[in-house]
């Protein structure tokens, strides 16, 4: 069985680990943040005007412009999701991966941001996996972010202690060594589904990730007018 395990987030959109002895990969999520920040910056004055507008025609025009900007932002996010899913599927094919595990991300909603359609990404990736005969498994992430993979801890309540996450993206192992927290979470997703893989310990599972930047839309200077 050749497996990749994916932890989904925002700053790091995808932390991808494996059981084939290769380094983890971190796909950065700065594109998602940039899209939302751009949307918020551009629409904030429009939303303020909308609150103060009493003329029906003016309100309709402002609402139309806000919705148009939201649609443009979502289109860029869809483009990013497509590019990320292509990268993941290509990686799977090149490394003969037959099973893809992915944590079910808890989406945080902010009123001033476009809601990121994570569900679309999951469906897109699942469809591509089915086409290439790759098993696709969604995994409940409970206890994966507060337990330590490299200390041999199962992702259970008994071992859960999130205080060891000393910084947003750093996890402190029991011996004092720090590893990438998203990589730790990704490995724990794998352990949750296939604990037998680690009966003989975690030697051979690499810690240091390779960072992947996937740029689209405004990242490449392609700003729609």
Model-derived regions, located:
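Positively charged, helix-rich recognition surfaces that bind polyanionic ligands
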Residues: 1-225
């Amino acid at each position: 069985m050749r497996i990749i395990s994916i932890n989904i987030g925002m700053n790091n959109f995808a932390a991808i680990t494996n059981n084939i002895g290769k380094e983890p990969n971190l796909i950065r999520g700065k594109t998602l943040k940039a899209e939302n920040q751009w949307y918020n910056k551009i629409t904030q004055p429009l939303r303020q005007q909308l609150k103060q507008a009493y003329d029906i025609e003016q309100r309709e025009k402002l609402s139309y412009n806000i919705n148009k900007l939201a649609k443009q932002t979502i289109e860029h996010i869809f483009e990013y999701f497509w590019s990320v899913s292509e990268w993941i599927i290509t990686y799977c094919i090149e490394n003969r991966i037959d099973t893809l595990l992915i944590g079910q991300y808890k989406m945080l909603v902010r009123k001033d941001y476009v809601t990121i359609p994570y569900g679309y990404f999951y469906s897109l990736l699942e469809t591509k996996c089915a086409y290439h005969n790759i098993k696709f498994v969604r995994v409940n992430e409970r206890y994966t972010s507060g337990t330590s993979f490299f200390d041999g801890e199962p992702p259970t309540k008994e071992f859960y202690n999130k205080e060891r996450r000393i910084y947003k993206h750093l996890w402190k192992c029991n011996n004092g060594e720090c590893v990438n927290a998203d990589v730790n979470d990704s490995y724990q997703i794998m352990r949750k589904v296939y604990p037998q893989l680690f009966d003989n310990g975690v030697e051979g599972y690499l810690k240091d990730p390779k960072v992947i930047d996937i740029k689209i839309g405004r990242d490449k200077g392609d700003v729609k007018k």
